Amino acid sequence: MSSLYYANALFSKYPTATSVFSSGVFPEQTSCAFASNPQRSGYGSSPGGTFPAGSAAHGLYSNGSSLHPQSPAMYPSSYGLDAASFNMHCSPFEQNLSSLMCAGDPTKQNSAKAEQRESELHNEANLRIYPWMRSAGADRKRGRQTYTRYQTLELEKEFHFNRYLTRRRRIEIAHVLCLTERQIKIWFQNRRMKWKKENKASSPSSNSQEKQETEEEEEE
């Protein structure tokens, strides 16, 4: 009994659903209210609330070419487009084409090449060439080849064991000592001549040995 009393006291504070709807808090609206509203923002409808279906159909189907209009009048004036705006990208293309045509002029190309040559010659004249930068060409004056102490020591060791070198051994020594094959060959020839002068004798055996050595040098 007490629980029912408290429940009635609680629900009596709030109005019923019928009283709420009858007072107009939630006005009844049907689906026809959306169609009857003349001002629907976002769809751009006419004040009458309906679209001119007849005029639209006539504009679409009256002419077959209307589906692909060629005139820029199809764009509204609100976009700020006119007939000249569609040709805005033509001018850069024409400028590039004209520049390419001008680049093919032989007189201008020759003048540009001449200016480039003059600038290169001017830059070369300002460069300072050191002796170690010069190439060893045919026009260079041939001088005496100097060998370092290490190179001379290694060549003397090799000459002590072999007075004549094979081509393979000559290439190996040239690679180790950072010399050319021709330099190794010339050094051994000069060293053999020096050795012959030091050990020169009048014995026939020595003369025959010298002849044999000269023949071997000619074969090389």
UniProtKB/Swiss-Prot annotation:
<feature type="region of interest" description="Disordered">
    <location>
        <begin position="197"/>
        <end position="220"/>
    </location>
</feature>
<dbReference type="InterPro" id="IPR050296">
    <property type="entry name" value="Antp_homeobox"/>
</dbReference>
<dbReference type="InterPro" id="IPR001356">
    <property type="entry name" value="HD"/>
</dbReference>
<dbReference type="GO" id="GO:0000981">
    <property type="term" value="F:DNA-binding transcription factor activity, RNA polymerase II-specific"/>
</dbReference>
<dbReference type="GO" id="GO:0005634">
    <property type="term" value="C:nucleus"/>
</dbReference>
<dbReference type="Pfam" id="PF00046">
    <property type="entry name" value="Homeodomain"/>
</dbReference>
<dbReference type="GO" id="GO:0000978">
    <property type="term" value="F:RNA polymerase II cis-regulatory region sequence-specific DNA binding"/>
</dbReference>
<dbReference type="InterPro" id="IPR001827">
    <property type="entry name" value="Homeobox_Antennapedia_CS"/>
</dbReference>
<dbReference type="InterPro" id="IPR009057">
    <property type="entry name" value="Homeodomain-like_sf"/>
</dbReference>
<comment type="similarity">
    <text>Belongs to the Antp homeobox family.</text>
</comment>
<keyword id="KW-0217">Developmental protein</keyword>
<dbReference type="InterPro" id="IPR017995">
    <property type="entry name" value="Homeobox_antennapedia"/>
</dbReference>
<dbReference type="GO" id="GO:0009952">
    <property type="term" value="P:anterior/posterior pattern specification"/>
</dbReference>
<dbReference type="InterPro" id="IPR017970">
    <property type="entry name" value="Homeobox_CS"/>
</dbReference>
<feature type="DNA-binding region" description="Homeobox">
    <location>
        <begin position="140"/>
        <end position="199"/>
    </location>
</feature>
<keyword id="KW-0238">DNA-binding</keyword>
<comment type="function">
    <text>Sequence-specific transcription factor which is part of a developmental regulatory system that provides cells with specific positional identities on the anterior-posterior axis.</text>
</comment>
<feature type="short sequence motif" description="Antp-type hexapeptide">
    <location>
        <begin position="129"/>
        <end position="134"/>
    </location>
</feature>
<dbReference type="InterPro" id="IPR020479">
    <property type="entry name" value="HD_metazoa"/>
</dbReference>
<keyword id="KW-0805">Transcription regulation</keyword>
<dbReference type="GO" id="GO:0000977">
    <property type="term" value="F:RNA polymerase II transcription regulatory region sequence-specific DNA binding"/>
</dbReference>
<keyword id="KW-0804">Transcription</keyword>
<keyword id="KW-0371">Homeobox</keyword>
<protein>
    <recommendedName>
        <fullName>Homeobox protein Hox-B7-A</fullName>
    </recommendedName>
</protein>
<dbReference type="GO" id="GO:0006357">
    <property type="term" value="P:regulation of transcription by RNA polymerase II"/>
</dbReference>
<keyword id="KW-0539">Nucleus</keyword>
